[in-house]
């Protein structure tokens, strides 16, 4: 006897009348229970987005074939198991985002398997190994950007992750690296860019007397820090904050935004369309 499974059906297609009925009727025909359903129409682009969480006994190929026959031309649909996803985290030296992900993965807050942590420095090895997670050093010393990214990508591929998370990984990725993991790389950065670029952004912000600081989590594409945005947040600061105070506050925002973004991504709620995201 087959046991019940839970899967997530994600659909992007040109908007038409009756799409929800078509999709849900096919699910009913396959004797699948709809646990949750969310949809959105982008009237500017004429696109329909739908996330449907299903439970039942699946015949994937038949279900997808039936959907293809019912959906308009130019539709994209995917059906994946619900539940735990597998990630590899890339790091350099900063511990705040990594530590937060390790704690939440182990003690609640993120249903995720951290397959490995890979760093271009060895600084965070002891932290990672406390959680019995493999740490790999792939040093950039003596290597070109392309050579180092090739080694990093090969190391990541060995773990077959669903996503690659940059937890304050301070290297600019080559287009070749990004192309190996399309819409699979998630980055966190402070929201000062491009106003405060380069080193010591919090010190630059302090000198300018900023009143808010924040962070942005986004997918990585070929343009530095310009990929589709998943999550953003800010906090208010004032004249009493030193540069060090701003840095501490900024790190708190960064780790919170990254974990919240990752939660949405792992739940298969984030749709990428062009350079935007739709979160259902």
Curated annotation (Swiss-Prot):
This protein's pathway: Purine metabolism; IMP biosynthesis via de novo pathway; formate from 10-formyl-5,6,7,8-tetrahydrofolate: step 1/1
Could you tell me which Gene3D superfamilies the record lists for this protein?
Answer: 3.30.70.260, Formyl transferase, N-terminal domain
Q: Quickly give the catalysed reaction.
A: (6R)-10-formyltetrahydrofolate + H2O = (6S)-5,6,7,8-tetrahydrofolate + formate + H(+)
Keywords linked to the UniProt accession:
Hydrolase, One-carbon metabolism, Purine biosynthesis
> Which positions fall inside the ACT domain?
8-86
Answer whether the UniProt record assigns the keyword Hydrolase to this protein: yes
EC class, as a word, reads hydrolase
* One MF term in the entry's GO annotations: formyltetrahydrofolate deformylase activity
**GO biological process: any one?**
'de novo' IMP biosynthetic process
The annotated active site, in chain numbering, is 225
Q: What is its EC number?
A: 3.5.1.10
Record function comment: Catalyzes the hydrolysis of 10-formyltetrahydrofolate (formyl-FH4) to formate and tetrahydrofolate (FH4).
- Return the similarity comment: Belongs to the PurU family.
Q: Which HAMAP family match?
A: PurU
Under NCBIfam families, the record lists: PRK06027.1, PurU
Q: What is this protein called?
A: Formyltetrahydrofolate deformylase
Species lineage? Bacteria, Pseudomonadati, Pseudomonadota, Gammaproteobacteria, Enterobacterales
